[in-house]
Regions:
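Hydrophobic alpha-helical transmembrane segments
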Residues: 36-54
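Conserved mid-sequence domains
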Residues: 157-176
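Hydrophobic, membrane-inserted alpha-helices
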Residues: 27-37
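Acidic, Ser/Thr- and proline-rich intrinsically disordered linker/docking segments
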Residues: 3-4, 76-80, 84, 170-226
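N-terminal topogenic membrane-targeting module
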Residues: 1-13, 53-135
Length: 226
């Protein structure tokens, strides 16, 4: 990230993330009242429908413009080494995406044995209200979404965004049959690959997949960015 500290970037991203499109909301309220008054005073149904349709279109356009205006720009200029390392991560995620189903394993069930699981799909995307010169791998993890930028993971939940530098990330990946300490969610004959991401700042995400090698490649690429 350029021209600013990591803390300043996170503050700016959180301001943008929490900002609501106030102008669009006001316009929606005004147009809604206008439609109600038109119906109350006997305006033709066709004219009211046309006005309502145009009002909805105007609110959508204004909302998008407002969100774009208040978005934060995050630009990257990578040296050759960082470029190679980051491309390795993007390539590894692409392979993981095409390797078969990927499951995020959440908290354990009440019996303490099984974990809740949810099907997820890696994508190239950006966090809400962020503009950038790159698209980054993103992965849902329960109520959080993990965005893998070149210098850190940005974690977005329903209330805020926070960052984890790769040197502070503990990552494991490979064949779940070769580990016992992570509690990887039981035996699934079709999903022997796993990827575990942990940090002292509170991240704890566990994924299962069909391709053991793809999971190991993602873990290796993440370690290469540390």
């Amino acid at each position: 990230m350029l021209d600013t500290s990591a803390d300043a970037v996170l503050r700016a991203l959180n301001r943008a993330y929490m900002r609501r499109p106030v102008l669009a909301m006001v316009l929606a309220a005004v147009f809604g009242l206008a439609v109600i008054e038109g119906l109350a005073f006997g305006a033709p149904a066709g004219a009211t429908l046309l006005f309502g349709s145009l009002a909805v279109l105007a609110v959508v356009v204004v909302s998008r413009r407002e969100i774009e205006y208040y978005s934060e720009a995050v630009e990257y200029v990578l040296d050759d080494h960082a470029t190679v390392a980051y491309r390795s991560l993007v390539t590894a995620f692409s392979r993981l995406k095409t390797s078969g189903p990927i499951w995020h394993l959440g908290r354990r069930t009440t019996d303490g044995q099984r974990r809740h699981r949810r099907l997820v799909v890696p994508v190239l995307a950006l966090p809400p209200r962020v503009r950038s010169n790159i698209r980054v791998p993103a992965l849902r993890a329960g109520r959080q979404t993990l965005y893998f930028f070149p210098d850190r993971i940005l974690v977005y939940d329903t209330q805020m965004a926070w960052g984890i530098e790769y040197r502070d990330l503990k990552v494991k990946g490979g064949d779940v049959r070769e580990v016992t300490e992570i509690g990887a969610g039981g035996d699934w004959a079709e999903c022997n690959g796993f990827l575990a991401l942990m940090s002292r700042s509170g991240l704890s995400a566990l994924f299962r997949c069909a391709d053991v090698k793809a999971a190991a490649e993602v873990a290796s690429a993440l370690e290469g960015l540390a």
